[in-house]
Amino acid sequence: MCPQESSFQPSQFLLLVGVPVASVLLLAQCLRWHCPRRLLGACWTLNGQEEPVSQPTPQLENEVSRQHLPATLPEMVAFYQELHTPTQGQTMVRQLMHKLLVFSAREVDHRGGCLMLQDTGISLLIPPGAVAVGRQERVSLILVWDLSDAPSLSQAQGLVSPVVACGPHGASFLKPCTLTFKHCAEQPSHARTYSSNTTLLDAKVWRPLGRPGAHASRDECRIHLSHFSLYTCVLEAPVGREARKWLQLAVFCSPLVPGQSHLQLRIYFLNNTPCALQWALTNEQPHGGRLRGPCQLFDFNGARGDQCLKLTYISEGWENVDDSSCQLVPHLHIWHGKCPFRSFCFRRKAADENEDCSALTNEIIVTMHTFQDGLETKYMEILRFQASEEESWAAPPPVSQPPPCNRLPPELFEQLRMLLEPNSITGNDWRRLASHLGLCGMKIRFLSCQRSPAAAILELFEEQNGSLQELHYLMTVMERLDCASAIQNYLSGTHGGSPGPERGGARDNQGLELDEKL
């Protein structure tokens, strides 16, 4: 009996111990095959107690999966068809595939063309000869207001421009096209352009284009494109140097009307670019908020702390509803260009029985200080707000939109600047053009102190929505036939036509789109 029992024990031990161990190993391998890597990483983090156990990791994973469900083929076709349909010179704002986009599209041929996004400082120039003779290409220019499409940045990097896409993705031309957009870096040499060679709906893969400062001027990025993709600009200061960018502080509120008991102010901390302000204006439209006064500039230091907004004065008859008179904006929210805002809510004080406060509360005056944490005594901006019930701004804004601002082609702009810059004995230089545009002697003397008076005058002409036909007429009147000839050559090369004999005649020509005037 004993020998038999001793010979039976090893096999019994294998059955009792080996089978459960093998089952556990097989189960672990199955889990490893089926469990996504992100979930496994989260499980290991929880087991290592590097994160609080209460973190709802599965819920976050489900939320992410719901937000990033792959688009169906019909959805993608409709998405790109909408973006590439000609907009007849108009700038469109649409929510497409959960992305807020601003875009314009048109067809171009061998004569080239220019696309502009209204009030954003973004343009795309397709030069003459970029498209083969006999062909037509649809092109689009897109401003991406989806913050998730921006590059993933380190604490040392700051976003200083919008994300811009040129479409269709991957399109190439016989000549380089020129993309122009604004940046807010204090030092242009620290501004580095990035490109993501992906479509709008794909995961972005951002890579630098050249060295820092290669495509940046004082406040603008200009990139010569060999093919179309996504582009942006990132602030990268050299080691040991401070990285800084310009912010614009914008104050919004709804109209103050009689009988209104509460009033809310919203203060936005935006990159100092036109498109950032347009985003805030668009964001305020559903709430009836309107911009109060001009934006104020702020020199934001990338190496400093959070931004503080401190309420210092409220006019009599009003009180602060919030518990605190000081609010903080996280440093990285501003540094990475997320367009944050903070708000204060005020209410009218109840009047005493023996005192009439109606005369005091039909107007509100507020003073706020804003500064980076720890720098209150060194650098601070003062924000003042005033509103009254009698102001005309309380009326709803008009429905009609202002006309877009035309823009001269860069190469023609530079050629005219060089021709008009030198002072002429007869006075038919940039000063004569300034007089034709309605500037008085004092303003002309002020412009003479600028770095490039001719460039300033040409920019003023752009802001007045002048066409090339009008500028040709002015040059002829000024007897500047060299400038008129340069404009004529550009028009002949791009449109095959001659400028109209009368000022404003181009606006009556229905055959020319807005972009084609330039």
From Swiss-Prot:
The signal sequence is none
- Give the tissue specificity: Expressed in pancreas, liver and kidney.
Stretches of the chain found on the membrane's Cytoplasmic side: 32-518
Start and end residues of each stretch annotated as Disordered: 492-518
Which residues does the annotated region (Peptidase S68) include? Answer: 208-235
Membrane topology listed for this record: Single-pass type III membrane protein
- Domain (Death): residue spans on this chain: 415-494
Q: What UniProt keywords apply to this chain's record, in alphabetical order?
A: Cytoplasm, Membrane, Transmembrane, Transmembrane helix
Q: Where in or outside the cell is it found?
A: Membrane; Cytoplasm
Q: Outline the segment boundaries, as ranges, of region: Interaction with RELA and NFKB1.
A: 186-400
Q: Where is the composition biased (Gly residues)?
A: 494-503
Q: Which family does it belong to?
A: Belongs to the unc-5 family.
Report the PANTHER family cross-referenced here: NETRIN RECEPTOR UNC5, UNC5C-LIKE PROTEIN
The protein depicted here goes by the name UNC5C-like protein
Q: Which organism is it from?
A: Homo sapiens (Human)
Organism ancestry: Eukaryota, Metazoa, Chordata, Craniata, Vertebrata
